[in-house]
């Protein structure tokens, strides 16, 4: 997997895009408005500057990270070559179902569809698609570039191949993945 799409440039989305881009992935960051995208890129830039100030990143690495991110206001323009799409929109079930239906229609057949939901059933979200075996939860903790934990949530139909790919991807990002079944609140929000 090389080409990542992140839907939503807010707090979680820009952190997810930052993390993938800093790890060397090409990221298409999508939001409904250019203003939201500009705010997201500004936040990523500020966070990268903080990492530089601590001596943990160079200006060249910052430029590479920002160069790995392309912004889009139309989902249809961003998904053509996606290997993984991570949805990080507002925690609203109807909105997520609508987005997943669009993702399913626009993404290549082999693309994995992930959600950053903290509480909505992965099985329910997968029902909006024709590829429930490729739908999975990938719940990052805030602030994403710093927090190591990521919950990998299997829906009823999520395949072992999809789970294994996202579990390993999380390790590549420097995260500590934990396997979670599709229960209300998953792990972090149940505690």
Identify the function of each model-found stretch:
Residues 35-46, 95, 161-172:
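A non-catalytic, amphipathic alpha-helix used as a structural packing/dimerization or gating element
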Residues 28, 70-72, 86, 136, ...:
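Hydrophobic/aromatic beta-strand patches that form the interior of the parallel beta-sheet core
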Residues 131, 152-183:
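Internal alpha-helical scaffold of NAD(P)-dependent oxidoreductase catalytic cores
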Residues 1-50, 54:
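NAD(P)+-binding Rossmann beta1-loop-alpha1 motif at the extreme N-terminus of oxidoreductases
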Residues 35-39, 50-52, 56-113, 119-120:
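Rossmann-like NAD(P)-binding element
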Residues 25, 80, 143-152:
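Acidic/polar active-site rim loop that often engages polyanionic ligands
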Residues 109-115, 126-141, 173-176:
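Rossmann-fold dehydrogenase core element
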């Amino acid at each position: 997997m090389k080409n990542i799409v992140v839907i939503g440039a807010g707090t979680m989305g820009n952190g997810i895009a930052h993390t993938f881009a800093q790890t060397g992935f090409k990221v298409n960051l999508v939001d409904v408005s250019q203003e939201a995208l500009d705010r997201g890129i500004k936040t990523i830039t500020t966070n990268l500057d903080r990492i530089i100030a601590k001596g943990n990143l160079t200006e060249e690495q910052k430029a590479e990270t920002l160069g790995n991110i392309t912004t889009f206001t139309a989902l249809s323009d961003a998904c053509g070559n996606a290997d993984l799409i991570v949805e990080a929109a507002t925690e609203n079930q109807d909105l997520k179902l609508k987005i997943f239906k669009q993702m399913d229609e626009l993404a290549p057949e082999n693309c994995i569809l992930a959600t950053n939901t903290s509480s909505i059933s992965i099985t329910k979200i997968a029902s909006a698609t024709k590829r429930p075996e490729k739908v999975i939860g990938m719940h990052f903790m805030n602030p994403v570039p710093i927090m190591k934990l990521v919950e990998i949530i299997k829906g009823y139909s999520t395949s072992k191949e999809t789970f294994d790919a996202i579990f390993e991807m999380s390790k590549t990002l420097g995260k500590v993945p934990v396997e979670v079944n599709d229960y209300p609140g998953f792990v972090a929000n149940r505690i």
